[in-house]
From Swiss-Prot:
GO CC terms of this entry: chloroplast thylakoid membrane; NADH dehydrogenase complex
EC number(s) on file: 7.1.1.-
Catalytic activities: a plastoquinone + NADH + (n+1) H(+)(in) = a plastoquinol + NAD(+) + n H(+)(out); a plastoquinone + NADPH + (n+1) H(+)(in) = a plastoquinol + NADP(+) + n H(+)(out)
UniProt enzyme class: translocase
UniProt KW keywords: Chloroplast, Membrane, NAD, NADP, Plastid, Plastoquinone, Quinone, Thylakoid, Translocase, Transmembrane, Transmembrane helix, Transport
Compartments where found: Plastid, Chloroplast thylakoid membrane
Protein name: NAD(P)H-quinone oxidoreductase subunit 4L, chloroplastic
Alphabetical list of Gene3D superfamilies matching this protein: 1.10.287.3510
HAMAP family (UniProt xref): NDH1_NuoK
Function, as annotated: NDH shuttles electrons from NAD(P)H:plastoquinone, via FMN and iron-sulfur (Fe-S) centers, to quinones in the photosynthetic chain and possibly in a chloroplast respiratory chain. The immediate electron acceptor for the enzyme in this species is believed to be plastoquinone. Couples the redox reaction to proton translocation, and thus conserves the redox energy in a proton gradient.
Keyword Transcription regulation: no
């Protein structure tokens, strides 16, 4: 693939995730948008690793590390969201007033 096409696609994914993260009022949707941002970053890592230095796999290995961290972040985030839903019966961000108590 051409480098510019992949970078434009990655930028679109990043901007869609950023827009969703800023405008989202639902915690699950915010977590999904955060994962979209991380996938755009992973796409950049793999693209630049392949384009600039094909003999070394530093970008690919770092991408796998980011995927592992993102999986742990998603599991912890969903556990927190399910706990908040059990206690508050809502997953809306503006209705969670956990810091006010």
């Amino acid at each position: 693939m051409i480098l510019e096409h992949v970078l434009v696609l990655s930028a679109y994914l990043f901007l869609i995730g950023l827009y969703g993260l800023i405008t989202s009022r639902n915690m699950v949707r915010a977590l999904m948008c955060l994962e979209l941002i991380l996938n755009a970053v992973n796409m950049n890592l793999v693209t630049f690793s392949d384009f600039f230095d094909n003999s070394q796999l530093k970008g690919d290995i770092f991408c796998i590390f980011v995927i592992a961290i993102a999986a742990a972040e998603a599991a912890i985030g969903l556990a927190i969201v399910s706990s908040i839903y059990r206690n508050r019966k809502s997953t809306r961000i503006n209705q969670s007033t956990l810091l006010n108590k």
